Amino acid sequence: AEAHVAFLDQQLKDFQAQHPALAATFDYSRRFTTYRPVHFSGKVRKDITLYCHLDTVNKEAPPKVLVWQKGTPLKIDVWQLPGAGTAEDTMFLLRRDNGEEYGMKGRLVLRDDVHALMHRPGTESFGASIDTKDNDLPSGEYMLSIMTWTSAGDLLQSTPLLHVTIP
C-alpha cells in the first residue's frame, strides 16, 4: 500500500511539473495557500449576512482556541446559511494577526439535518468541510472564517468562527 501511495504522489508531482499553471489550484484544494480564485477576490457584501456554525474540529466539539501543530492534519465541518441565494462555492479563510490570508477550498456537503431545520428549498447542500493532511503555515495567531460565492453572484464572509494558534 505504501508503494502505491508513493507511486500516486510521484504521478501527481509529475503532472504538476508538466502543468505548472494548475499547481496553485491543486494546492488550494488540499491545503491552505495564498492562492485565491477570481470569484473570491471581489468585494465582500457587508449588507448580506452569511450565517455559519462551526460544528466540529477534528470530529470533536470546537475548542475556544485551536492549537494546530505543524505537520498535523485538520478536519473542520460547518453549516452555513447565506442571507441571499444558495452556496455555489466555499473557501475556508485563515487570516493571520499581521493581515496575511490563506485560503483552502471547502467541499460543499449534504446536510439533511440543516435542511430539515430550515424548511427552505436549496438548503440541502449548506454544509461545508475541509480535510487537510498537513500544516506548513507560518507560526502565529489566526482567525478562521468562511467565504461563500452564492448563486445570486454575491461574495459573503462570516464573522470569525475560531481562533487558531500555530506554534
Regions found by a protein language model. Give the residues of each.
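Surface-exposed, short loops/turns at beta-strand junctions within beta-sandwich domains
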Residues: 134-139
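A short tyrosine-centered beta-strand micro-motif
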Residues: 140-145
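Intrinsically disordered, polar/acidic, low-complexity terminal segments
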Residues: 1-75, 163
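Beta-strand-rich extracellular modules
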Residues: 147-151
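Short edge beta-strand/loop segments characteristic of extracellular beta-sandwich folds
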Residues: 75-83
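Extended low-complexity, serine/threonine- and proline-enriched intrinsically disordered segments
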Residues: 84-105
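Short beta-strand elements
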Residues: 153-167
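Aromatic sugar-binding surface patches on proteins
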Residues: 111-132
